[in-house]
Amino acid sequence: MAMQPGTSLPIGGLSYVKGSDTPPLSELTVPALLANTAALHGSRPAVVFREQNIRWTWNEFSAEVDRMAAGLHALGLRKGDRVGIWSPNRFEWLLTQFATARVGLVMVNINPAYRLAELEYALNKVGCKAIIAPEAFKTSRYLDMLATLAPELAKAEPGALNAARLPLLRWVIRMEDVPTPGMLT
């Protein structure tokens, strides 16, 4: 195989370069790695979020990932679609990371400190079709900021958002189980 001049990188071929294999690197996908770990250590603790009173085994975590992945797919999100997560460290963030990988979606990690202009730019730049966010964190009122950017949300059916400032965004998913116009929970 031809190499790029001055490097050990191949021209064409695989989309990655495989270096030293000592110790051997896993070539498993994230979903396959989760499935293998659940099969090997299913009843052992996997996820602990004390602040949210969550303690899941590998089997429980894998089942929750499957449930969320199925939900994202049921929304019509397909391989390559972008899903934003605008959140501090919470179990929903971890769940989203694995569920988007399971479906083949691209998880877009949005900085929890972003304000209106930064959020608008990020969502439009990467073309998020969905965003998952809590109501608020510290002094940031996430859902209020989304409502400012997309006032159409108040009258939209979930999944039918047609916001002038966020033209690709269709789904707003609220982390808390509180019914909110235009949003899923």
Residues covered by each model-derived region:
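Flexible, non-catalytic linker and terminal segments flanking ANL/adenylate-forming cores
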Residues: 1-28
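AMP-dependent adenylate-forming
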Residues: 9-11, 33-57, 176-180
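Short, histidine-centered active-site or binding-site loop motifs used for metal coordination
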Residues: 15-18, 50-53, 127
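A short, structure-level motif marking secondary-structure boundaries and short turns
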Residues: 18-20, 53-54, 80-82, 103-105
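Short, flexible loop segments at the rims of nucleotide/cofactor-binding pockets, characterized by
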Residues: 22-25, 60, 108-111
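Conserved AMP-binding/adenylate-forming core of the ANL superfamily
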Residues: 26, 35, 46-98, 115-120
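Structural core segment of the AMP-binding/adenylate-forming
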Residues: 75, 103-185
